[in-house]
Amino acid sequence: MSVLSEFKAFAVKGNVVDLAVGVIIGGAFGKIVESLVGDVIMPIVSKIFGGLDFSNYFIPLAGQTATTLVEAKKAGAVLAYGSFITVAINFMILAFIIFMMIKQINRLQSAPAPAPAPAEPPPPAEDIVLLREIRDSLKR
């Protein structure tokens, strides 16, 4: 088998195609989460903490006196911990959403099959039926 045909067989396997689809959807989903955090959650957090903009939180490492992160990065090295806070919140939200999705998938996959209806008990043996008839006739 040639290398090209082996690669073709590998590339069209279900797992590889599923992985490719997952990566593409994951990239798009990451952008959704990034927008959720940047455009919805962080403004609310900023409002709660008095109008703070976490993206501009930094510590200058070169002694510069810039007022924004962009200016500080142009002037020298900075420790941009505000950006890190935003990325950490992105990660926590994304990890939680993925955890909930996997939890639901596992619940659906491991749903127990419905229990079969109980089978009717087998009819009693002929000698038991005969003995019951004799007993019933003696009671009368």
Curated annotation (Swiss-Prot):
Record-linked Gene3D superfamilies: Large-conductance mechanosensitive channel, MscL, domain 1
An example GO CC term for this entry is:
plasma membrane
Name the family the entry cites: Belongs to the MscL family.
Example of a GO MF term: mechanosensitive monoatomic ion channel activity
Its annotated function is as follows: Channel that opens in response to stretch forces in the membrane lipid bilayer. May participate in the regulation of osmotic pressure changes within the cell.
Q: What is this protein called?
A: Large-conductance mechanosensitive channel
Please list the disulfide bridges. none
Membrane topology summary: Multi-pass membrane protein
InterPro entries the record matches: Mechanosensitive_channel_CS, MS_channel, MSC/AndL, MscL_channel
Q: Where are the transmembrane segments?
A: 21-41, 82-102
Q: Quaternary form?
A: Homopentamer.
Q: Which keywords does this chain's UniProt record carry? A: Cell inner membrane, Cell membrane, Ion channel, Ion transport, Membrane, Transmembrane, Transmembrane helix, Transport
Pfam families from the UniProt entry: MscL
Kindly list the places in or outside the cell where this protein is found, as annotated in its UniProt entry.
Cell inner membrane
Q: Which organism is it from?
A: Leptothrix cholodnii (strain ATCC 51168 / LMG 8142 / SP-6) (Leptothrix discophora (strain SP-6))
